[in-house]
Amino acid sequence: MEEFQGYLELDRYQQHDFLYPLIFREYIYALAHDHGLNRSILLDNVGYDNKSSLLIIKRLISRMYKQNHFFISANDSNQKKKLGYNKNLYSQKISEGFTVIVEISFSLQLVSSLEATKTVKSYNLRSIHSIFPFLEDKFPHLNYVSDVLIPYPIHLEILVQTLRYWVKDASSLHLLRLFLHEYYNWNSLITSNNFFFSKSNPRLFLLLYNSHVCEYEFILLFLRNQSSHLQLTSSGIFFERIHFYEKIKYPVEEVFANDFPASILWFFKDPFMHYVRYQGKSILASKDTPLLMNKWKYYLVNLWQCHSYVWSQPGRIYINKLSKHSLDFLGYFSSIRPNLSVVRSQMLENSFITDNAMKKLDTLVPIIPLIGSLAKVKFCNALGHPISKSTWADSSDFDIIDRFLRICRNLSHYYSGSSRKKSLYRIKYILRLSCLKTLARKHKSTVRTFLKRLGSKLLEEFFTEEEQILSLVFPRASYTFTFKKFYRGRIWYLDIFCINDLINYE
């Protein structure tokens, strides 16, 4: 990060709070094309390579230096033809470069904060799978859960004001307003899920979304830690901060006295309250009674409405009993089920049997939505019957097999934490047979004839990494028995940073 800091001359610009001049640097767009620093943001931009070239960037920067006002109304087609450029492409390029500049600024502030507090940064916690061991450890001991849809700000100017606490360059903020006006209806009073997770410029919208959510989560985390003695102890953290982790002398009570009525300002001690955020949603889970869960619900709604200026209705937040409710969580169906075990004990001449019931987190593959995703991309029909991928029939045999293998292994890799592997085997069966039908269609043959000619080597290619390891460790004779016995266990990986489109069926 220090190398990028010197290369991008951020020190010199940040002394005067200027980030705007960096938008004229060519290497900013090169970093945007390279999907961020150190591949920190793993987003697939399909077709991006066809649109990116040094000539386009040079032409774009030249137009900015000449102060050509190319952000014109989309209805003014005559002016657009006269200037002779693709307005949408240029505006997207500039917004991507702007996002990289702000990301670098945030990263440098975060690194300096971690160094000041001597906090060790764990890259393993970035993995999506890292949350599931936490749920396995905590959720079996909890009673109630609430799946909450995080509300959105009522106007886009709120997003700009949130970013203003971290970016003090007024020119950059005006440029951000221009992007929001281009990509979305600025006069709209209600934002939506489609806005924040739009595929037109995901990096910019995810940056705005995370900065918006980070504000209220920072407050929620602090008040959770101070819940039992908030009125007795004054804290030095001021939430309407200008810098990232600035601390000043105002106590928390003075800040929140203007935002919350007196009845909301008292809190209760709850050491079993857990909060998890994912894909625009959050989970509140607790061991307490429904009454205390309702208090947390109304507190959260008041926090959103009074401090973050978003509208949320308490009636849309449902509190469910964890033992009778399934969570649609990050591509898994998660629920708590009793795990019965029988223990035979013997004392002298008497023996007795004891039944022990322990709660366990059950993670299942959502087979119906996943088959729907496969049917949507033409690997099977709506009933789950494999069909040939006709659009891939013109590719070489190696490319066809490689594409199917990558999809199969990615799905197996992600769903390796499933409690039951049967559904996963069905998905792999669909992909295997779809691959065979695609190859048979290309060679104008039947699946049976093509499989006889190729042999069983093709099916062995679809083995996952776990199956390959077991086949190497154990002898071939005992492999089948060993595989069935040991492969039922769940495996969580710490290198999964993004969700495949097939898994993200929402």
Swiss-Prot record:
Subcellular locations according to the entry: Plastid, Chloroplast
Origin species: Prunus dulcis (Almond)
UniProt record similarity statement: Belongs to the intron maturase 2 family. MatK subfamily.
Any one cellular-component term (Gene Ontology): chloroplast
Key words, A-Z: Chloroplast, mRNA processing, Plastid, RNA-binding, tRNA processing
InterPro entries found in the cross-reference section: Domain_X, Maturase_MatK, Maturase_MatK_N
UniProt GO molecular function: RNA binding
Principal location listed in the UniProt entry: plastid
Record function comment: Usually encoded in the trnK tRNA gene intron. Probably assists in splicing its own and other chloroplast group II introns.
PANTHER family: MATURASE K
A Pfam family: Intron_maturas2
Name of this chain's protein: Maturase K
GO biological process: mRNA processing; RNA splicing; tRNA processing
Highest taxon of source: Eukaryota
